[in-house]
Amino acid sequence: MNKTPLPNPETLAPRWYLVDAANQRLGRLAAAVATLLRGKHKPDFTPHLDTGDYVIVINAEKVVVTGKKRTQKLYRRHSGRPGGMKVETFAQLQARLPERVVEKAVKGMLPHTRLGRRQFTKLKVYVGPNHPHEAQQPQVYPLNTIPGAKA
């Protein structure tokens, strides 16, 4: 019986990708970023190993949603105290913390396990076009989340 070759975790060199979120659909952007973080785009993908890459998302404040989600999509958090439920809409959260919108969307598309939490730490989200990771020489990842639009 043949044994499936597993990639050696020490030899896996993660790459850095730069994704521009300006005028991109939130869900489709998050799905593409989650794929990069998990490493599913690689031929040596292994579900129980962290084979993913680092992803830098810029212009998080310019991400868009369709329909009435801007006013109807709700984000909830609880302080842990009685009556401590806080609810805000997509528009309110995007105005207050635009990075959080992208982070929550991507986190929901990663496995809810220890490995998923470790993969989530490889996501770096920034408001505006600037980021402090120039030393890693990130590759621009071409992304078009608008169906029918030219790239």
UniProtKB/Swiss-Prot annotation:
Pfam families tied to this protein: Ribosomal_L13 (PF00572)
TM helices/strands, residue ranges: none
InterPro entries tied to this protein: Ribosomal_uL13 (IPR005822), Ribosomal_uL13_bac-type (IPR005823), Ribosomal_uL13_CS (IPR023563), Ribosomal_uL13_sf (IPR036899)
Alphabetized NCBIfam families for the sequence: rplM_bact
An example Gene Ontology CC term for this record: cytosolic large ribosomal subunit
GO biological process: one example: translation
Gene source species: Synechococcus sp. (strain JA-2-3B'a(2-13)) (Cyanobacteria bacterium Yellowstone B-Prime)
Protein's job: This protein is one of the early assembly proteins of the 50S ribosomal subunit, although it is not seen to bind rRNA by itself. It is important during the early stages of 50S assembly.
Oligomer and partners: Part of the 50S ribosomal subunit.
Protein name as catalogued: Large ribosomal subunit protein uL13
Alphabetical UniProt keywords: Ribonucleoprotein, Ribosomal protein
Family: Belongs to the universal ribosomal protein uL13 family.
Superkingdom of source: Bacteria
Example of a GO MF term: structural constituent of ribosome
PROSITE patterns cross-referenced by the UniProt entry: RIBOSOMAL_L13
